[in-house]
Design a protein with these regions (language model features):
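Conserved ATP-binding subdomain of kinase catalytic cores across diverse folds
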Residues: 1-174, 179-245
Length: 245
């Protein structure tokens, strides 16, 4: 059972019971797209006669997401650490994600999140939030190089971003694809999609994929990252604009 804390971090707001109920329902809706049998549903937590009950008949005081529990050792991040992930797993994930992205929703609102304006806003926010870590986890030279490179790319590739929008490549994606959100068990479960902020999941499918590819490279598995990218391109039919962006 998963309960949301009544917190407000700016990018997420769970401060009212109604908001927590809504985001519990969104979490189930979004994650059933990739692992329906892992997300069982949303249940009220009630209080009566001095006792809390899950699914009771009293007035709800909280809501919870009921999920199927899987063993932590089946996490892809753990299996990578033990050297248990091979190219077949990459092929399977590529097939799953290409199909998922093909079926994911898109509309005029979602497409707008692929605009230069919003992409730049996301990057500027990222740079603002990481500025305080200069000299601690990133050097000033590295920080400025990354910022300059990103801003130059955005200025130079306006037509590329417009093409991706017109080609309907901006979708309601997962938003947090990395090896810690994938179970390799009786089958592949890709879970924990972002429910609390549209701006994190309304994105180019290339951005969704890039997060997982980057994670594999960070874990020193460039071979698996390259395999996943190659197979995703094969299965999805994406062209040169996908690789360029």
């Amino acid at each position: 059972y998963k309960i949301k804390k009544p917190v407000n971090f700016g990018f997420l707001d769970f401060t009212t019971l109604e908001k927590r109920r809504f985001y519990c329902e969104e979490e189930v809706r979004l994650n059933r797209r990739l692992c329906g049998d892992m997300y069982i549903g949303v249940l009220p937590i009630t209080y009566s006669s001095g006792k809390f009950r899950i699914g009771g008949s009293g007035e709800p005081v909280e809501y919870t997401v009921k999920m199927r529990e899987l063993p932590q050792e089946a996490l892809m991040s753990e299996r990578l650490r033990r050297g248990e992930i091979d190219v077949k797993v990459m092929d399977d994930i590529a097939r799953i994600l290409s199909d998922f992205h093909r079926r994911a929703d898109t509309n005029s609102e979602i497409r707008e999140y692929g605009s230069i304006r919003i992409v730049k806003f996301n990057w500027d926010e990222n740079f603002d939030q990481t500025r305080e870590f200069i000299g601690r986890t990133i050097g000033r030279g590295e920080y400025l190089f990354i910022k300059r490179t990103i801003n130059e790319f955005l200025k130079r590739q306006k037509s590329l971003f417009e093409l991706r929008q017109k080609s309907d490549r901006i979708r309601e994606c997962h938003g947090d694809l990395h090896s810690g959100n994938i179970f390799i068990a009786d089958k592949i479960y890709i879970y924990d999609a972002i429910e609390f902020n549209k701006r994190f999941r309304y994105c180019d499918v290339a951005s969704d994929m890039a997060f997982l590819l980057m994670d594999l490279e960070f874990l020193n598995r460039r071979d698996l990252s390259a395999r996943l990218l190659d197979r995703y391109v094969d299965y999805s039919g994406e062209g040169g604009d996908f690789l360029e962006i």
